[in-house]
Design a protein with these regions (language model features):
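Conserved N-terminal entry element of GNAT/NAT acetyltransferase domains
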Residues: 2-40
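Short, flexible loop/turn elements at secondary-structure junctions
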Residues: 38-41, 87-89, 98-103, 140-142, ...
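Short, well-structured beta-strand/strand-turn elements
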Residues: 60, 67, 267-277
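Acyl-donor binding region in acyl/amide transferases
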Residues: 64, 104-268
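Short, cationic low-complexity segments
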Residues: 307-331
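Short amphipathic alpha-helix that is part of the acyltransferase structural core
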Residues: 26-71, 75, 81-101
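A short helix-loop-beta-strand connector motif used in the catalytic cores of GNAT acetyltransferases and
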Residues: 74-84, 107, 269-270, 280-286
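C-terminal/domain-terminus segments
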Residues: 270-308
Length: 331
């Protein structure tokens, strides 16, 4: 039985907690503001995040079923930080992520990280030694319901773009970060055959051959792999993508926006397989890893370089974004 979602938090309370010292940057589009907050310094903002997350995830077919989507990872001394986009004209949250730096990951008695994804994925020794110290885990990405329909809200089209601005700034602020680790989510309401085509396509073009991270209970496709192989016959990513887009549209669906966004971010993205998140509406979570210095140039310029132009003092000599900057200077 789903609980009734809490009422909106008073906007004056939210504004009182969104102080200048917590502001990360302005967005490239729409003149929105990006903040980093925690449960300790912004308890009312966190409640509003939990409310908006639960609304957005329920609408898509997931969610916790609780009055707000907050868990143990949102609280405590080693909690995830919350990155949010704030619309200063409407005084409301547009969307957000939560994140935790690899250097702050705690390990359990088996040597596995205590993360929001730990119940679904096993991390190899190689990942823990060679990747974890330079990785930031991203999770619970959401766009508030009011900003998901571009037909009714002209700023909706920039909601995801605004979130990427925040992630771009993180690579500059945290010099050790070289990788984004996170999940792509597919919901049970999405047609099975379309889901299978998307996951097959992703595995074909982005599969991790090193088994750096593996799902504990890998999701099995309903569609025979031979049928899918007969559909995706191209070696080229773009050619196969055109096939995917066409076939999914035939089913009356679109490729989910976040899946599209991740695929278009880096040609060397690593895919770690898919597991079912039984505590979150049985959504299907696909683990991914993106190397920051291999993000496509258009995305780098928009989301990383734009922050450095505004805040050159933030770029540290060891920053994971340095490879991006100096690579472009050499061209």
């Amino acid at each position: 039985m789903e609980e009734e979602i809490i009422q909106p938090i008073d906007r004056e309370l939210l504004k009182s907690e969104l102080t200048p010292d917590k502001q990360l940057r302005m967005t490239n589009k729409s003149h929105n503001e990006i903040y980093i907050v925690t449960a300790k310094d912004s308890p009312n903002v966190l409640k509003e995040i939990g409310r908006l997350r639960e609304i957005a995830f329920r609408e898509a077919g997931g969610g916790t079923g609780k009055s707000m989507d907050l868990d143990e990872f949102d609280f405590g001394d080693n909690c995830y930080k919350q990155l949010i986009v704030w619309n200063p004209e409407a005084d409301e949250i547009i969307g957000g992520y939560r994140y935790l730096l690899g250097k702050d990951w705690l390990l359990d008695e088996k040597g596995q990280p205590k993360l929001a994804t730990s119940h679904m994925f096993h991390f190899s020794d190689k990942f823990l030694k060679e990747y974890m110290p330079y990785t930031v885990e991203l999770g619970r990405s959401f766009v508030s319901l009011e900003y998901q329909n571009v037909r009714t809200n002209t700023k909706s089209i920039f909601a995801l773009d605004n979130l990427w601005d925040g992630l771009g700034a993180l690579t500059v602020l945290y010099p050790e970060v070289k990788y984004f680790f996170g999940k792509m989510t597919m919901y049970p309401s999405y047609i099975r055959r379309g889901r299978d085509m998307i996951l097959y396509f992703l595995k074909k073009h982005f599969d991790d051959k090193e088994n750096l991270v593996i799902p504990m209970k890998p999701l099995k496709l309903d569609t025979p792999e031979s049928d899918l192989a007969a559909i995706f016959t191209e070696d080229d990513f773009k050619a196969d993508y055109r096939i995917l887009n066409r076939e999914v549209r035939k089913l009356g669906y679109n490729i989910p926006p976040l899946v599209n966004a991740y695929m278009s971010l880096s040609p060397t993205m690593k895919l770690f397989g898919t597991a079912i998140n039984y505590g979150f509406g049985d959504v299907e979570e696909t683990g991914i890893l993106i190397a920051i210095d291999e993000i496509l140039e258009e995305k780098r310029v928009r989301h990383i370089n734009s922050f450095i132009d505004e805040h050159p003092e933030a770029l540290k000599i060891t920053s994971g974004a340095n490879n991006v900057i100096y690579k472009e200077k050499d061209i």
